[in-house]
Amino acid sequence: MALDPECFLDAEYLDNLLGDDGEPAQLPLLSRQIDAWQLEQASAYAGAAAAAVEQHNARAFAQALAIYSAPLASVLGCWLQGMSAPGVFEDPAQLRLMQLFAHDVGVGYPNASRAHHFNALLGQLQLTTYALAPAQLATLPDLNDDAFELPALLQALSRRSDAFGDELCGVDWALRAVGLCPGWAAMGQLEGLALELGRLDLSAAFPGLEPASLRHISQWVAQRIIEQGEERQARLLRGANWLFGALRRWNARLYNASLTATSPQQAMAHLMQRLARVGAVYHQNYLIEGRSLALWLEDAQHDPLPLLDVLSRSRLIVPGNAKKSLLVTSLVAPTGRMFRIFSEADLNVIRQWIDWLPQAGTTEQLPRQPIDSCAMAARPTTASAADTGHWPQSLREAYFVLQGRALQPTTLKFAHAYVSRWLERSRQSLKTSERQLPEQWGTQVLRGWLLDKHDQNGQQFDDSDPAQIPSREEIVESTLQLAPLTLIDGAWLQGFTDVGLASSHVGYTLFQTYWDELGNGIEALNHPKIYRDGLREMDFELAPTGSREFAEDPRLYEESFRLPVYWLCLGKLPVTFMPEILGMNLAMELSGVGGSYRSARRFLRHYGFSTAFVDLHNTIDNVSTGHSAWAADAIDAYMRSLTSAEQVAAQWQRVRVGYESLAPMPGKWTSMLRRLGLSSAGNVLPRPARAATSSRYLHHLPITREVLLETHEP
């Protein structure tokens, strides 16, 4: 469930899962504890690796570590995927968190995330069976449930970053402080394997970006939270301390899993424990030392060592001589009763164990690491009425409610209904629209069409009369009314910060576009901030975008919130409406390039206003290497993934509707109202099946103190 970017999880349940371990350690002390733990674990893994090498099992040692690590490695970076939200688009600390996340996903490249690098390592270790997406990994029966405990909770917390934002910053602080997990570091030190582990070091920057100290960035963000006071600091410390405890438990299990390669006894114990449940069904009548083998196998599901002890004394085994042992010779031959019960890898484990048995009394086994118990909270059976969320009654209310990220069930229904109504109007508009995508998709079709549209935009600008300039009042009013839209620039792509989408062939350019809109971690390049500076130049000082005061500002028309609400809804439904988002994104990125941005520049310069915003967009949205080109590439990547002509036709039509949805032509009723001088803004709202109210808004708290002080709580 937590892998779904559109899911909603109960914050109270997640809060119980985090638990309360008493007084948390302060960051300086916790940092020293992490350093000491890493040294201790480095020594432990070095001993285990040496034992594995002595048994000629270096590769098996690395494989055991990699297999258990797969669930966690598959979601690296996920704890930050839900932090960015429209209401905090201008918060400098949020921009730095997005910078950290960009390094984690390998912004600008497909399949360049830390998780994808781990999958490449799995290939080197001949473990491609495990090189899967997280949802597929969860279906593999041979992966222990406890391997999913930490990654599952990290995913779940990320879906409620409105409630756990400070805790997640603490989680990030601790993970960057650890850097490279000790078990993974041990994999990189094995001779003869040449495994490159640098990309798994969470403190290391992505080579495709400017060098940066991710640890220092995370520490800077943590300091901004500490400045907010004791309550926020306590939540930060809770997240950091919880993560360190959870990571120690995960690491102990990882270490214990690696011991299978350090000793034939450990490997055999693991094998018997894995196969015991199935075997218990078939051996009721076979006795070993007067007891049914089925009963021995039943006990072995929890403790396999007693079974190994009696098995070593049975007639099935000749200690020190696997070639004469019935268990791995006649019983598993084509005519034997256990033919094909064991895989070839299983048989190798059994043979090594048999040959090793004479040394059992003189060989010291590496001890397993103890695992601290962690109480799990019970899942709530019902949700309170307050948890159902809001069904906004006006566009202004919808704009305010949707400034967060998570959507409660009722609000989710509203968002789905709003988008569906908008798209239905766009579908009707498409029948007569003159600004359509080609009727059919094909390779190279979209890029050629894109260049043609760019030429048309440029020609329209060249043909325009430079002397025809709107009045200063018109320019100022237009800039003001665009504020609800432009101050959430990129909101339609919000869902593509999901770690899986952000690094996919379809989504990587969309995430890069989103990251560009927010300034690439640099406050001075943040598009909403640049636009707000332009508003100040025109003597408009607007409230923070995420505040109720902004949504209720009487200077802003109700009509000015229609398209922004569509963007806000669309961005929270990246899976349900992916084709439409792809089409709308292309329409948006292409809308001003070559033409209207140049016209806007002319008008703004004429009256002495800054042209920074339109200048920036006219360059980064270009059709060759900019956002418009990336938008077309994302569509092509999506269409190439489809496998049948029917799918191509259906999905392309959805993309075309999405393109039209940026500016669908008004219907007859809307046109009539406009001729009468009446507003139709409220008419776009879907009507609820029943009234729904909630006292809570799932908004994100600003991290930077200056931003927090500017924000007015509802």
Task: Label each PLM-derived region with a short phrase.
Residues 1, 382-400, 693-714:
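Terminal accessory/targeting
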Residues 1-46, 389-459:
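Extended, charge-enriched "interface" segments that sit outside catalytic cores
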Residues 25-204, 245, 252-273, 436-606, ...:
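Active-site-proximal alpha-helical scaffolds that flank and shape metal-associated catalytic sites
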Residues 97, 169, 233-240, 343, ...:
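Hydrophobic packing residues in well-ordered alpha-helices of helical domains and bundles
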Residues 149-152, 213-224, 326, 596-598:
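Extended amphipathic alpha-helical scaffold segments
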Residues 199-218, 298, 302-309, 596, ...:
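C-terminal hydrophobic structural anchor segments
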Residues 206-266, 620-711:
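Acidic, carboxylate-rich catalytic segments that either coordinate divalent cations
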Residues 253-394:
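Aromatic- and Gly/Pro-enriched helix-to-coil junctions and flexible linker segments
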